[in-house]
Amino acid sequence: MPAAQFDPDFTKNAFRNYLKEFYAEHSRQMKFCGNTPELFGEWKKSARQRVLELLSIDHLPVKTPEIQIINEVRYDNYTMQKIQYQTLPELVVPAYLFIPKNCSSPLPTLLCPPGHGNGINQVIEEEGAYYKYPHAFAEAGYIALVPEHISFGERSASGQSECRFDHEALNLLGSTVIGYRMWELQRSLDILESLPQVDSNRIGCAGLSLGGEMTLYLA
């Protein structure tokens, strides 16, 4: 291009503009375009399989971890146990397990994945956005399990979120941190289903922010 026609603004934005065009051409290739329940069922099956492929966790084992009880706090209507369990030989998951008292087992149960923040202790102690909601579930007669996500809270060396490094590292290794978190939550569900107090036909999931995102993936 002759010097007189050189446009520095075009050069600066050229690759971003290319990416926008590329995205417009290739985005939402799995969107649902049907109009019947039957077509939706077919789409859901293929979309679910594609999501699992993109999460890249098929190399991870499927087994129910054993839990270790660290301590227990007793409230009037329920107990709160601090527990931990191994999902891999190198990975330990701290968690809180809430069990109502004086209720007929098996009980309805909720898995409560935390959101972005300071982890499980924030969820069970903070009066703000979380409203200590696992305590409220236990008061209402639900068993509740609050597991610590990879990169947060007690699983962070700095005590702050380290998800950016873990996200980028796993991407370079051909996997995803979202996939690892979902896989660990699946193991949490396995633990709940193994407990005699739990009604395995009435297990739900409830989370805020990242916890809400992980609830969608689990569903």
Each model region followed by its residue ranges:
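Non-catalytic accessory segments flanking enzyme active sites
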Residues: 20-98
